[in-house]
């Protein structure tokens, strides 16, 4: 499907005169109010207008419309209760089984199960639920919901939702399922673009032993294969503990990242252990050492021809696929609108203001000065990923890898230890076993992810990367994060009062709760005992991390706005625009601290390419996570508070946070704690 093939959706007036429909609605309203009483007048009027908003000529003529309304309006509370319960139960089954099929179809692509064949990619890109919304409008189940339950605006949910009952919130979420009427072919096109971008990102590995410097030295060990951007970034972090070669490694990784972002990286070095590459000069030669069992392709020319803007061509494909849904979403006519007003339920302007509040805080140069004093040198751009505030930085990667590989040689070994890990996090033994019994652990092809369930009878899946030598620190750190997702997924589905309220307000909350777990990774290994200084250091780490990812999010937001402003852009034009946006963002928020201009490093995030404007969830998640962690500290533990919060369900972000912590979402808690942490830690290295 091309963009030109998408036209504005037809309305009922295209085949039925507006006068006819207006007259029919007037008569129906009077008839139903007379039948069910004045107490139903508001519901009748609202329901009729909601149905009319989506009714199309193919749905039937005036007589069909009248017959449908008379047959399906629930005019008393008992009938409405039966309808609500039935839809809730059956939609859980539908969602659950569709999700189960999708998971199975994606397994070869998502899991470390050998080569991905062309047909595997087709299976992975197929969305069995793509036609469901279309079907529900065709069979008029969607219209039944719209006739009986309220569609609401974000403003109404924010301002009126404070006084709603849990049942009212569940009804609101039920109606929201049918707030758009997007054709199945559009949903399929979006799923296909998402699958293609996932494949591109999941295969973007760099063989680190084959990076050489000007002297031909290899700084990284054999067989090290790092996925961009996650593993490259994390290797920068662990290198702070390497007093001999850490700085050289970090500078080299920065060069690699910049080559990827600018697309000057030689195509031949991507996922290829058979060539050596000097990122500084961009020289490529046949490998002079071998650290893989794979065989080099015959007759492959070893040249440094750059990747042909594939990174930005892939991003453009996701934009053009997402844009196909725009005409069918009149209240949120761009992906940007849908992400903020529907998915996050926090206005974009408010998100931007919160991020700006952190990035321009006078605390930033104070923390930067402290980092410089600890490093004993001026900051360099890659120090945006400084992690020396974390207690674990005193351990080398090799020490952590050895400890973890021995403890978790397989995915099954990690699964068996989940109850113990949850008990260490403060969950009562019974609840730890309850959650662990509902988690399946799979070896991931990529960096790892958590796949929830959509019905209570299904288990959630934790996907983590397991090397042949066993789990390493990077894999463990990600696994703990994904385990946080999994526990939230279990509690917010199995223990919430209405399954229609399954989940949390938005994915920033999902990330926030996962960060709570991830921040305890070293404690789970028995390597850190929290005290006042450690807590202050963790606060500084959270603040610096939010400073970093906040800029990344602003780049992601600006790039999507640019694509909407330039719908006919080429990959090369998008590349140049992204680089300029990255430079402008760096120059505004980071040059005053780092003293260097026009740095493009923050555009390295793979999420920018395959995640459809997901990145703002991370800094919002950091702010939310900090508020949540502060509450857990006040309460004296993670487990019970985590469970209380996770079962609040999918209400608006501020309402959820008010119930969880007593205050709305904001940056103030992090900024206040950072100020106190600076006083606690001082300027001592």
Language-model region placement:
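Contiguous, non-catalytic segments that form substrate-binding/exosite surfaces or channel walls
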Residues: 285-459
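A glycine-rich phosphate-binding loop feature that marks nucleotide/adenosyl-phosphate handling sites
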Residues: 273-281, 435-444, 505, 535-537, ...
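Feature representing long, continuous alpha-helical segments
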Residues: 485, 511-519, 549-557, 580, ...
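Short, glycine/acidic-rich hinge or "gate" loops at secondary-structure transitions
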Residues: 270-276, 430-436, 495-509, 527-534, ...
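C-terminal, non-catalytic "cap/extension" segments appended to globular domains
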Residues: 4-291, 322-395, 568-685
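Alpha-helix capping and helix-loop boundary segments enriched in small/acidic/polar residues
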Residues: 409, 449-450, 466-478, 500-509, ...
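Active-site recognition of the HExxH zinc-binding catalytic motif
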Residues: 462-493, 514-515
């Amino acid at each position: 499907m091309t963009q030109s093939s998408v036209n504005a959706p037809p309305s009922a007036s295209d085949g039925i005169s507006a006068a006819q429909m207006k007259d029919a609605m007037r008569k129906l309203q009077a008839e139903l109010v007379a039948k069910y009483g004045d107490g139903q007048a508001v519901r009748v009027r609202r329901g009729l207008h909601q149905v009319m908003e989506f009714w199309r000529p193919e749905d039937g003529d005036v007589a069909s419309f009248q017959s449908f309304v008379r047959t399906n309006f629930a005019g008393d509370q008992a009938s409405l209760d039966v309808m609500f319960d039935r839809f809730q139960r059956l939609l859980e089954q539908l969602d659950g089984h569709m999700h189960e099929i999708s998971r199975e179809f994606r397994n070869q692509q998502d899991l470390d199960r050998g080569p991905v064949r062309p047909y595997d990619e087709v299976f992975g890109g197929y969305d069995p639920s793509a036609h469901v919304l279309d079907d529900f409008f065709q069979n008029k189940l969607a219209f039944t919901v719209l006739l009986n339950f309220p569609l609401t605006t974000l403003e109404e949910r924010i301002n009126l939702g404070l006084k709603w009952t849990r049942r009212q919130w569940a009804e609101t979420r039920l109606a929201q399922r049918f707030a758009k009427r997007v054709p199945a072919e559009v949903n399929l096109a979006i799923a296909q673009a998402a699958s293609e971008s996932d494949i591109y990102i999941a295969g973007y590995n760099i063989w680190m032993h084959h990076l050489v410097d000007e002297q031909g030295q290899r700084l990284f060990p054999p067989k090290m294969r790092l996925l961009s951007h996650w593993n490259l970034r994390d290797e920068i972090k662990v290198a702070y503990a390497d007093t001999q070669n850490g700085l050289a490694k970090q500078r080299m990784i920065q060069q690699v990242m910049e080559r990827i972002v600018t697309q000057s990286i030689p195509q031949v070095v991507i996922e290829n252990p058979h060539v050596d590459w000097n990122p500084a000069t961009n020289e490529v030669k046949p490998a002079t050492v071998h650290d893989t069992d794979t065989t080099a392709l015959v007759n492959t020319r070893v040249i440094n021809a750059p990747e042909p803007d594939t990174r930005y061509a892939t991003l453009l494909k996701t934009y053009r696929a997402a844009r196909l849904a725009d005409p069918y979403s009149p209240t949120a006519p761009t992906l940007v609108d849908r992400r903020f007003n529907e998915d996050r339920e926090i206005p974009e302007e408010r998100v931007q203001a919160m991020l700006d509040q952190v990035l321009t805080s006078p605390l930033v140069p104070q923390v930067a000065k402290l980092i410089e004093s600890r490093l004993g040198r001026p900051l360099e751009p890659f120090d945006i990923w400084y992690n020396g505030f974390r207690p674990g930085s005193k351990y080398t990667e090799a020490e952590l890898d050895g400890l973890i590989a021995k403890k978790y040689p397989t995915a099954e070994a990690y699964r068996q230890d989940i109850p113990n890990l949850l008990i260490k996090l403060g969950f009562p033994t019974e609840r730890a076993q309850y959650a662990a019994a509902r988690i399946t652990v799979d070896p991931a092809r990529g960096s790892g992810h958590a796949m929830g369930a959509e019905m209570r009878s299904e288990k959630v899946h934790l996907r983590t990367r397991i090397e042949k030598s066993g789990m390493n620190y990077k894999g463990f750190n990600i696994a703990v994060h994904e385990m946080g997702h999994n526990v939230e997924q279990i509690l917010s589905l199995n223990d919430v009062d209405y399954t229609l309220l399954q989940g949390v307000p938005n994915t920033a909350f999902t990330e926030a709760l996962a960060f709570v777990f991830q921040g305890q990774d070293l404690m789970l290994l028995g390597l850190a005992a929290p005290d006042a200084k450690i807590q202050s250091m963790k606060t500084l780490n959270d603040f610096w991390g939010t400073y970093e990812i906040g800029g990344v999010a602003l780049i992601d937001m600006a790039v999507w706005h640019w694509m909407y402003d330039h719908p006919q852009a080429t990959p090369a034009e998008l590349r140049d625009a992204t680089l300029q946006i990255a430079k402008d963002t760096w120059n505004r928020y980071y040059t005053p601290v780092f003293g260097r201009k026009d740095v493009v490093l923050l555009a390295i995030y793979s999420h920018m390419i395959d995640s459809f404007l997901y990145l703002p969830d991370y800094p919002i998640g950091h702010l939310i996570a900090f508020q949540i962690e502060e509450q857990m500290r006040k309460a004296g533990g993670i487990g019970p508070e985590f469970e209380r919060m996770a079962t609040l369900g999918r209400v608006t972000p501020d309402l959820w946070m008010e119930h969880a912590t007593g205050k709305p979402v904001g940056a103030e808690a992090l900024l206040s704690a950072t100020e106190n942490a600076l006083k606690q830690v001082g300027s001592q290295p």
